[in-house]
A protein has these predicted regions:
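Phosphate-binding/switch loop-helix module in NTP-utilizing enzymes
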Residues: 185, 190-232
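NTP-binding/hydrolysis catalytic cores, primarily Walker-type P-loop NTPases
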Residues: 320-357
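Inter-motif core of Ras-like GTPase G domains
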Residues: 216-221, 232-253
Length: 357
């Protein structure tokens, strides 16, 4: 009201609220109620039963895994937790993408028209990341008719090949299939190609489809390491059944031209959906500057495909032998994790409209 003096800040601080005016009974009074056999006063007054959902939750920060943040957390006995760094949060996000669920099974074909650009190495790299981070089964199939070397990248645990798997009429369980595969330290399994060049060349589209029908029953992610020839019989089945392509290129001009020619051929032969969904991998074959400006290659392939990733040179990968993720340089491993996360972004897509099965 006009002329009425406003309360001072001290009065705001000490003024009783409506809830405070309903004074709670003194603890001594409650004690006397119990002593006299009287029922204690019920809370809350409105008779609503409290729920655990009403209790505010405080989520503890995750402990940092590296750097000065981890040192501070360790030295303080956990009393001081700076939280995870931006890099650790980014890695956590990549891992979550890689671990997202798959609709049934997911099939990835890795291919290149040019040999020696790291196709088999990339197949092993992606597969190893998936197998080590995910909890389900991941397998790579060697469909190279020209004496594929995929099985040389894992400890050899069996002499079986795709041909032996096809001839086995007693496959009823995962254990029956496992007898035909070798497994890397990452948990990635490999099904070897036929070692006889004549028999390998005769590996047909129908036989590839039969192999996939078996593997689909027991594996969540199936990678196929293709040969360099697009006209080989099995390639028709590979391209028809693949959900996504990983196209391998080197940073040299001839490698880039071969990758571009592969995209052209796929588009002309009814696989334009695979081109649009393809992930291009540019492998750097040696230390130092690449022969072609990487940014120009990125721009060219991004205009046609879903993503482009560059994998740095790594001496362990260059050995061409068994791949151990623990021996990779941290930058190489990070690049492979990012590549796997990009491929995994397509896991939730419904590919049934593209045919296959």
């Amino acid at each position: 009201m006009p002329g009425q003096q406003a309360p001072s800040p001290e009065q705001y601080q000490h003024a009783p609220t409506p809830q405070a005016q309903q004074q709670a009974p003194h603890p001594q009074a409650q004690y006397q109620q119990y002593q006299q056999g009287q029922p204690p006063q019920q809370y809350p007054p409105n008779g609503v039963t409290p729920s655990l959902e009403d209790v505010p939750m405080r989520r503890a920060k995750k402990a940092p895994g590296s750097g000065w943040r981890r040192a501070v957390h360790h030295m303080s006995g956990g009393a001081i937790n700076p939280g995870m760094s931006a890099e650790e949060l980014r890695l956590q996000e990549l891992v979550a993408r890689i671990r997202q669920p798959v609709r049934g099974d997911y099939r990835i074909a890795t291919l290149s028209l040019k040999g020696g650009v790291g196709k088999t190495t990339t197949t092993m790299g992606i597969g190893s990341i998936f197998a080590s981070i995910r909890g389900d089964r991941v397998i790579a199939v060697d469909a190279n008719p020209d004496f594929g070397t995929l099985s040389q990248r894992v400890p050899l645990q069996t002499r079986s090949t795709v041909r032996d798997l096809l001839l086995d009429q007693q496959i009823r369980s995962y254990g029956d299939v496992r007898r035909h595969t070798s497994q890397a330290t990452s948990r990635l399994e490999v099904l070897a190609s036929e070692r006889d060049p004549a028999a390998s060349e005769s590996f047909s589209e129908d036989e590839y489809r039969q192999v996939l029908r078996v593997l689909q029953r027991f594996y969540n992610i199936i990678l196929t390491d293709c040969g360099t020839g697009l006209m080989h019989s099995a390639m028709a089945g590979v391209l028809d059944l693949a959900h996504s392509l990983v196209l391998i290129s080197s940073s040299a001009i001839d490698g880039a031209r071969s990758a571009a020619a592969t995209l052209d051929w796929l588009s002309l032969h009814g696989h334009d959906h695979l081109v649009r969904n393809a992930v291009v991998v540019i492998n750097l074959p040696r230390e130092g500057s690449p022969n072609v400006a990487i940014q120009h290659l990125r721009e060219y392939f991004l205009a046609r495909c879903r993503a482009v990733h560059v994998i740095p040179y790594d001496p362990h990968l260059a050995e061409g032998a068994e791949i151990d993720l623990a021996r990779l340089h941290k930058n190489t491993k990070r690049a492979l994790v990012e590549l796997a996360a990009t491929v995994a972004d397509d896991f939730a897509t419904d590919h049934r409209r593209f045919g296959g099965y």
